[in-house]
Amino acid sequence: RTAPGSTFKPVTAIAGLSEGVITDNDYIYCGGRFDKLPGAPLNCWLLSGHGALSIRDGIANSCNVFFSETAYRLGQNEEGTFNDNTAMQKLIQYANLMGLDKKSGLEISEASPQVSNELPIPSAIGQGTHSYTTSQLARYATVLASSGNVYNLSLLDKSTDSDGNLIEDYTPEMIDHADLSQSIWDDVHAGMEGVITKSNWGIFQDLNVTLAGKTGTAQQSKNRANHSLFIGYAPADNPQIAWAIRIANGYASTNSELVAKDILNYYFGLKDETEILTGQASSASNSNAGTD
């Protein structure tokens, strides 16, 4: 298990929209740092700042200040006073709604997830005490892709006898549903499509299938490279596949995106297998900069 990094930001977006602390018409200004609470400010990965961002732009640009401000508003009372516990409980509520408080249902041993229970501002951008397996993030990606359907995952499709007769069909079991307004899902989906078309188009521009995604980097130790993460689904308008990729100590999220590109080329038959499995390593980024 590791922290999810910025792949968690859609949860914060959903919480903010559902609780009414942000709307489609709101813009939050990013000047490069969030400094409304005592102590060291929380920096955006873009130190010069993103400027004014809508909810969709906040997701597409993975702006730390946008989601820190959203969490801050979640914790404010009617007088504007901020309460850590109030903000934290709302983030927990919507993380649980996305199924992040449950094991994924796989038929093998799996670590229990940890939804962050302290430090709401860092938690809103995927830090805090969050800790999830890759399979739990894959289930979360499926919830986003399906507009709220929480399924138990399975390693099996079906079992047959030696003659090909069906013994058991492992149809996905829907265990919950996140009942949100369609406008909220539209904002999240558009933001995740923007991650691809606005922020990472150079990687996917020659891929003949549309996709939506969310990148992430998670720091576990200052002495080791960040973990590289990328969740998503495709095609963007009618998902057939959802995924979560984590490369332990894999530096930038770009490296996970390159893995996803190979998977999609193979899954949709866009490239011959011999073009994908070359026996040679791809060029990878060894930058440890947090740009998502």
Model segments located where?
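Beta-lactam-recognizing serine transpeptidase/beta-lactamase-like catalytic domain environment
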Residues: 1-6, 11-248, 289-292
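Intrinsically disordered, low-complexity acidic/polar segments
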Residues: 240, 252-254, 270
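Short, charged, low-complexity patches
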Residues: 137, 252-261
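Short, gly/Ser/Thr-rich active-site loops of penicillin-recognizing serine hydrolases
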Residues: 166-168, 173, 259-292
